Curated annotation (Swiss-Prot):
GO cellular component: extracellular region; late endosome membrane; lysosomal membrane; MHC class I protein complex; MHC class II protein complex
Keywords: Disulfide bond, Immunity, Immunoglobulin domain, MHC I, Secreted, Signal
Signal peptide range in chain numbering: 1-21
GO function term, MF aspect, one: peptide antigen binding
Protein name: Beta-2-microglobulin
Subunit text: Heterodimer of an alpha chain and a beta chain. Beta-2-microglobulin is the beta-chain of major histocompatibility complex class I molecules.
Disulfide linkage: 46-101
Keyword Cell inner membrane set for record: no
Subcellular location: Secreted
Ig-like C1-type domain residues: 26-113
Pfam families, per database record: C1-set
């Protein structure tokens, strides 16, 4: 009986370890809430999805500097156990400024630039 428990515990440990070993790189989408108008206030959104494990850093940048007033949704997960999160702030597009979303996941940094709608 004792060896059965040992095998069951070992099997459970291996199963949990395998779940922790699965990683999925994030997909990043950067977009404005409304079509961009130079000089008019808008919302800048960065939607990060399909990532695992859930530990992640997401920053919105203006000219390479972290933007103030950034808000983020709760971390949520999908049916496949990957996670997603929306990060957003108010911004005013201009011809001189660049806006980006910087994501660091599992030690890998990705930066996606916002492009105005045409």
């Amino acid at each position: 009986m004792g060896s059965r428990w040992g095998i069951a515990v070992l099997g459970l440990f291996c199963f949990v370890s395998c779940l922790e070993a699965i990683t999925s790189s994030p997909k990043i989408q950067v977009y404005s809430r409304h079509p961009a108008q130079i000089g008019e206030s808008n919302n800048l959104n960065c939607y990060v999805s399909s990532f695992h494990p859930p530990q992640i850093s997401i920053r919105l940048l203006k000219n390479g500097q972290e933007m103030p007033g950034v808000e983020m949704s709760d971390l949520s997960f999908s049916n496949d156990w990957t996670f997603h999160r929306l990060v957003h702030t108010v911004f005013t597009p201009s011809n001189q400024d660049t806006f980006e979303c910087e994501v660091v996941h599992e030690g890998v940094k990705k930066t996606v630039k916002w492009e105005p709608d045409n």
